[in-house]
């Protein structure tokens, strides 16, 4: 029964792979077969050994894609600010309440915020419950909106990777 389960999962993923990438070259068929078989085996072993670590890879990829998108968006905003003749900077300091508790999680969150142009992690409170962030742009002085963007954007994804 267990062997049948493996074959069904691999056959299903290979079929979806062929349907997704309709290419009739022999090399493409071998590549699809190899890749989908590898994914199927990883998926099956994740249930046997550690299901959580398998999905953490996808959460990490999601975090990296989100960070890259935010970095490019902020870079263009800062670059536009530099070349435009009129300044529209609305800078300020905010205290973001933290849900992350471990030192590594806090460090990664603070680093991601600091690497995004226009924001800088300044300090962490002694009880590790607040992260103080200097932001170059606080839209219309709406501090709560910026806090929500940090919490729903970076912090939520960091928590998903580590929990």
Residue map of PLM features:
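Short helix-capping/hinge motifs at transmembrane helix termini and TM-loop junctions
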Residues: 22, 49, 84-85, 163
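Contiguous hydrophobic segments
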Residues: 1-15, 52, 56, 83, ...
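Terminal membrane-proximal soluble interaction domains of membrane-associated proteins
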Residues: 90-163
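Short, flexible segments with low predicted structural confidence
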Residues: 32, 50-51, 84-85, 129-130
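Flexible, solvent-exposed loop/hinge segments and secondary-structure transition points
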Residues: 61-103
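Membrane-targeting alpha-helical segments
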Residues: 1-79
């Amino acid at each position: 029964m267990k062997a049948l389960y493996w074959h069904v999962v691999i056959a299903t993923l290979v079929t979806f792979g062929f349907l997704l990438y309709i290419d009739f070259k022999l090399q493409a068929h071998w590549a699809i077969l190899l890749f989908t078989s590898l994914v199927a085996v990883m998926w099956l072993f994740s249930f046997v050994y550690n299901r959580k670590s398998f999905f953490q890879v996808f959460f990490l990829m999601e975090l990296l894609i989100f960070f890259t998108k935010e970095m490019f968006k902020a870079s263009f905003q800062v670059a536009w600010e530099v070349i435009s003749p009129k300044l529209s900077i609305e800078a300020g300091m905010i205290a973001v309440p933290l849900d992350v508790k471990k030192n590594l999680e806090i460090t990664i969150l603070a680093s991601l915020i600091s690497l995004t142009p226009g924001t800088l992690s300044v300090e962490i409170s002694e009880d590790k419950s607040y992260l103080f962030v200097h932001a170059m742009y606080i839209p219309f002085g709406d501090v709560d909106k910026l806090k929500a963007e940090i919490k729903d954007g970076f912090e939520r994804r960091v928590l998903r990777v580590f929990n």
